[in-house]
Amino acid sequence: MVASARVQKLVRRYKLAIATALAILLLQGLVVWSFSGLEEDEPGEKGRQRKPRPLDPGEGSKDTDSSAGRRGSAGRRHGRWRGRAESPGVPVAKVVRAVTSRQRASRRVPPAPPPEAPGRQNLSGAAAGEALIGAPGFPQHGDTGSVEGAPQPTDNTFTPKCEIVGKDALSALARASTKQCQQEIANVVCLHQAGNLMPKSVPRHCQLAGKMSPGVQWEEIRAQQPVGGPPVRIAYMLVVHGRAIRQLKRLLKAVYHEQHFFYIHVDKRSNYLYREVVELAQHYENVRVTPWRMVTIWGGASLLRMYLRSMKDLLEIPGWTWDFFINLSATDYPTRTNEELVAFLSKNRDKNFLKSHGRDNSRFIKKQGLDRLFHECDSHMWRLGERQIPAGIVVDGGSDWFVLTRSFVEYVVYTDDPLVAQLRQFYTYTLLPAESFFHTVLENSPACASLVDNNLRVTNWNRKLGCKCQYKHIVDWCGCSPNDFKPQDFLRLQQVSRPTFFARKFESTVNQEVLEILDFHLYGSYPPSTPALKAYWENIYDVADGPGGLSDVLLTAYTAFARLSLRHAATAVSPLATAVCRFEPRGLPSSVHLYFYDDHFQGYLVTQAVQPSAQGPAETLEMWLMPQRSLKLLGHSDQASRLQSLEVGTEWDPKERLFRNFGGLLGPLDEPVAMQRWARGPNLTATVVWIDPTYVVATSYDITVDADTEVTQYKPPLSLPLRPGAWTVRLLQFWEPLGETRFLVLPLTFNRKLPLRKDDASWLHAGPPHNEYMEQSFQGLSGILNLPQAEALEEAARRHTELTGSALEAWTDGELSNFWSVAGLCAIGPSACPSLELCRLTSWSSLSPDPKSELGPVKADGRLR
């Protein structure tokens, strides 16, 4: 009775608050209902809205040698300003100060779609699932992984053929960005709900019970014994993407032999790499490029389709009589010589080498998502619901890097065995199908006894760093990726207990020294006078790609780099030579390269066509822009000495713990991250303060750094646009400085690839409304931080919002010159300017000699290296 009276009293006291809460809930319900349609995002959002994540939370971490980790854990929809505080692989940086995140309602699909309108055609021509049943495992018109590439144009409506009720399917329909993809998803789900998509059972032909897991040991003495019969010949399938042509050439140089065959598939999105590979292949009869290309996304069914089609090609190329199929990526490298590999495979010429996950099948099935239905479209793998594993077979899987015999490849490609046909159908709708398809087919086939549980690779797995759900933007699941090898990992490359012939991953932009060590271990050192052994170049823009791949920030920066360099050329020579060394840029830069030396980023190399101001023919110059160091380490105590570096950038890679935006170029609409590196030492709590160019304190937050923390990083949810100019990030302990760095928010001279107009500049360069970067104001800290009065800076910032044309370029160039310097210029051809050296004679130009990545003619021993 007393409790009831107390409840009534509380209700009377807080009835207004309760009524308000109920009203808010009602309003939220109306908002969610209003978003339940499938209309596209409004164009006024300028493309900055993010798609909602998968719906339910995940489970567990990843199995050995399998890339699937756990179910997508980003199911709850976060607002566009949601920040993160995390320290990959080390204790999490704890954000002590509260920051408010904004949330938007996610869209949903009505649970009962209307019936199909009479006479209306399916967007994909035929139901996606029906077409795939007719030809399982082969690309269909409009598939992401098909030769034709992106989905075909269609009308703006789609009509499900059934009532779609599963939450995964409804979530996928709400998030798919094209109507064709929505139609494909609906078709697949309806077929699955009707029981007409997945095989119920699959025949098993293996006469052995249970899982096959024999191993083969590496014996150095036995490997050197003579081989009975002719040595095996290998078909290497190189699956590549990106722009790292020099690393690909280095790999090909290491594995090449004239007795082997090399078939290269370049992702359809990697046009620069494709052009380079086509040119490379023209010089070697046993190197070919697939005449078709697919978009192969991580975890997608398109990767398996690509492998199956490549295998068929390799079987049908006249004169290519190979014995083993080995797939490699551009981030692989051999760990033993070709002679050792050929000798080993010749002794085991009837074996298929695939790495299995282990003994716990049920755990693997759950973590790999094999009991879930997936479909690939819009360059995304959509989770559509649950399914049953077919009865009658043993399901296996692990790594999607393998060594297969020709006879097994022929069986997979040509057989009409229901085992293969039905498993193709099953794996068409499977996440990471290449990690399980070949394992499962082999383990249930008549050749099951040929399985060896070893894929002859060593992979640099670091679960704490590699399993960060880094692929959740392209797949509704949490995946893992191996880390790059570094010199400290070299002992792992020298496997002695089991045969390993390849290792992954290697990235020259992350660490090239480990490749030098491995290359020396295999083939000996280059002559002492060999140039560029510690240098690495990687193209990031080529004029043949068109400006579409460039952001406004990069377009602004590259053109400004060219102007700065040409002014430098005109002022760096004697007065008598000034006239012939004065140039004007012609058009946009023709190429841009990243330049590294001794595993340190050295800057950008910009190639630009120019016209001499004096009479003379047009020339092409390459310009080296080097970043200027802006870090100051200020602390002297034991705790303060822990700070090693403080950086601000974008494209943070939690696996390798670096910024993939190597030059740190960012603009007003970017969302920067502050990262700190620490030495081991006593625990400490530090305060991070962000200050904009007009001394507005944008934000402040605390981070806790434990004794063994190595890296902390956090992206504050700042309101956009950021004010252009020089920003400062200070790191303090008890308000005493530990360190400070400056970074540039670049004023843009382009917007949507066109010169910036005044009406765009008025908001793009003005900073956030009312100078409020956060809902909470931190301007009260200006006194503690001893910030000066900023009236003059505020007035200058206001005037900058009115700039366009040459005045805007002058402001941009001035800001950029405070953070970048011209380190070199060279001429690609003859130049009238006497101070310009030929690029091929320099040590830094992208046109200078690079013997380690140059292929050359085949040697007498059949090799290139």
From Swiss-Prot:
The chain crosses the membrane at residues 16-36. Pathway: Glycan metabolism; chondroitin sulfate biosynthesis; Glycan metabolism; heparan sulfate biosynthesis. Disruption phenotype: Mutant mice are born at the expected Mendelian rate. Their livers display strongly reduced levels of heparan sulfate proteoglycan. DCN glycosylation is altered and lacks chondroitin sulfate groups. After 3 to 5 months, all mutant mice display increased liver weight. At an age of 4 to 5 months, about half of them delevop liver cysts, due to biliary epithelial cell hyperplasia. At an age of 3 and 10 months, mutant mice also display increased kidney weight due to hydronephrosis and impaired renal function, but they do not develop cysts. Residues 73-82 have a biased composition (Basic residues). Residues 37-865 are lumenal. Residues 1-15 are cytoplasmic. Active with either Mg(2+) or Mn(2+), but activity is highest when both are present. It is an enzyme of class 2 (transferase). GO terms for biological process: chondroitin sulfate proteoglycan biosynthetic process; glycosaminoglycan biosynthetic process; heparan sulfate proteoglycan biosynthetic process; heparin proteoglycan biosynthetic process; proteoglycan biosynthetic process. Keywords: Disulfide bond, Glycoprotein, Glycosyltransferase, Golgi apparatus, Magnesium, Manganese, Membrane, Metal-binding, Secreted, Signal-anchor, Transferase, Transmembrane, Transmembrane helix. Detected in brain, liver, lung, kidney, heart, spleen and testis, and at lower levels in skeletal muscle. Its EC number is 2.4.2.26. Glycans are attached at N122, N327, N683. Residues 39-155 are annotated as: Disordered. Contains disulfide bonds. GO terms for molecular function: magnesium ion binding; manganese ion binding; protein xylosyltransferase activity. Monomer. Catalyzes the first step in the biosynthesis of chondroitin sulfate, heparan sulfate and dermatan sulfate proteoglycans, such as DCN. Transfers D-xylose from UDP-D-xylose to specific serine residues of the core protein. This is Xylosyltransferase 2. The gene is Xylt2.
